[in-house]
């Protein structure tokens, strides 16, 4: 070992200790997660929920667009029909162990029934516990769009009732009467 190699080796050791000394007193970048809340951006895509319309009814009309739009095929549902003619999902299942939280199901939903919330704490010990049924996904409120009602906006009538005669539904506006 030559003197030059010895000096270079000693210099790298001193430089390493200098860098350690500099970074030892800097503010830590690691967040202590459970104690400190995590900042999430406003449009963060986390847990998927099913919402209700302002009347308290299920928004999902079992159109199957969410299942078709899902790139990994983690959504499955079966359509059924109420006596008044409204469709609803007999069962609605999402396998969160396969879900990539891309948000395509939310974009495809015409009734805004599927919404992604900023909740990300979904850790389970068993893979079977990550398969959520409709009862697990359905929340009591309307979610991000509190005033939107698919049947009212689309102008669809319900069997046995004219447009605007359903519970908590306003009569349709005659737009032709507004023209000059």
Curated annotation (Swiss-Prot):
Residues that bind [4Fe-4S] cluster 1: 60, 63, 66, 109
Single GO MF annotation: iron ion binding
Catalytic activity: a quinone + NADH + 5 H(+)(in) = a quinol + NAD(+) + 4 H(+)(out)
Cofactor: binding comment: Binds 2 [4Fe-4S] clusters per subunit.
4Fe-4S ferredoxin-type domain span: 50-80, 90-119
Keyword list, A-Z: 4Fe-4S, Cell inner membrane, Cell membrane, Iron, Iron-sulfur, Membrane, Metal-binding, NAD, Quinone, Repeat, Translocase, Ubiquinone
GO cellular component: plasma membrane
Predominant location: membrane
EC numbers for this chain: 7.1.1.-
GTP-binding is among the record's keywords: no
Highest taxon of source: Bacteria
Biological process, per Gene Ontology: aerobic respiration
Record membrane topology: Peripheral membrane protein
Class of this enzyme: translocase
PROSITE patterns (UniProt xref): 4FE4S_FER_1, 4FE4S_FER_2
Family membership noted in the UniProt record: Belongs to the complex I 23 kDa subunit family.
Protein name: NADH-quinone oxidoreductase subunit I
Organism: Yersinia enterocolitica serotype O:8 / biotype 1B (strain NCTC 13174 / 8081)
Organism lineage: Bacteria, Pseudomonadati, Pseudomonadota, Gammaproteobacteria, Enterobacterales
Gene designation: nuoI
